[in-house]
Amino acid sequence: MRIADFDPENRPRERFIAHGPAALSSAELLAIVLRTGTRKNNILDTCNTLLSLHGLEALANMNLKELQKTSGIGPSKAMQITAIFELNKRLHYKRNTNRKIQGARDVYEYMQGRVPDETKEHLFVLHLNTKNQITKCEEVTIGTLNASLIHPREVFKAAIRESANAIILVHNHPSGDTEPSNADRQVTNLLKQASAVIQIDLLDHVIIGKTGWYSFRENNQLS
């Protein structure tokens, strides 16, 4: 059935106009953006399939090639979907500019949507001013943390250049398990020693997983 064949009061566009976006399901909102379906499936069916297969959160992180594996999603629609979520991420970043960090929860919330590929480990450095506000988020390395591969110079170089008062290390665990590995502990100790020499405080090292985090400071592993 085509969307045009729906009763007028059940069409997503008409319901949007009458009741606002909050009255629509995620699939209906996506259908309004993508607009047209195929001969076999109307766009609402396609959007329902997308969301039932992947969910909204996973959909936000899919690339163009992955999106096009779903019937009815070609290059143009894949780009539209990607553009929607990219705008949302940019709004999130804008709202969090100069956010004051009071604990690991703030770090976890700030980093939502910032890891480009959650199948790999990414190490980020957050630069903080004297008010503990984030002034910059810098990605330093991609891949498993290893003390022999991470040089303090690379971690502190931008912080020195921008006169950061302190930094926070953040990296993700693709497995979702936030328990630190021996390598994580070695890297933390190495950079803590370097911070004392450089006189830029290492406030915390936060490991983020799918639904939580581990803070070295909050677990008394970083005094």
UniProtKB/Swiss-Prot annotation:
GO terms for molecular function: metal ion binding; metallopeptidase activity. Keywords: Hydrolase, Metal-binding, Metalloprotease, Protease, Zinc. CDD domains: MPN_DUF2466. It comes from the Bacteria. The keyword Mitochondrion does not apply. Residues 100-222 form the MPN domain. Zn(2+) binds at residues 171, 173, 184. A motif (JAMM motif) lies at residues 171-184. Disulfide bonds: none annotated. Pfam families: RadC, UPF0758_N. GO terms for biological process: proteolysis. Belongs to the UPF0758 family. This is UPF0758 protein Cvib_1178. It comes from Chlorobium phaeovibrioides (strain DSM 265 / 1930) (Prosthecochloris vibrioformis (strain DSM 265)).
